[in-house]
Amino acid sequence: MDTETSPLLSHNLSTREGIKQSTQGLLAHTIARYPGTTAILLGILILLVIILIIVAIVYYNRSVDCKSSMPKPPPSYYVQQPEPHHHFPVFFRKRKNSTSLQSHIPSDEQLAELAHS
């Protein structure tokens, strides 16, 4: 049984080796004949692969960021809350403080009275 399959295997391997050698010979011949063009084409190919990797990383990061960020509720949601909780971001508390500070700002009429006195 080994004697029947071994010639087929050896023939198959020799065919593969022949194809491999002819391909390597063609590449070597092309590189030797056109070294500048081959270098330019290889450089362009490498740059395209690098750009493709960068674009894939950026696209993946954006899709992860979009999934992780929660949809923000409308601004009226925060107005209806009687007291801002501690887990809210700080700028919502500052907004409430700024509205309370605006009530202490004197109006134009009060400023005119102060200027005349």
From Swiss-Prot:
Example GO biological process term?
A: symbiont-mediated suppression of host innate immune response
Q: Which residues cross the membrane?
A: 39-59
The recorded induction information for this protein reads: Expressed in the late phase of the viral replicative cycle.
Q: Does the keyword Plastid apply?
A: no
Q: List glycan-bearing residues.
A: N12, N61, N97
Q: How does it sit in the membrane?
A: Single-pass membrane protein
Gene Ontology CC annotations of this record: host cell endoplasmic reticulum membrane; host cell Golgi membrane; membrane; virion membrane
The entry's localization annotation reads: Virion membrane; Host endoplasmic reticulum membrane; Host Golgi apparatus membrane
Question: Does this UniProt record's set of keywords contain ATP-binding?
Answer: no
UniProt protein name: Minor capsid protein p17
**Species this chain originates from:** African swine fever virus (strain Badajoz 1971 Vero-adapted)
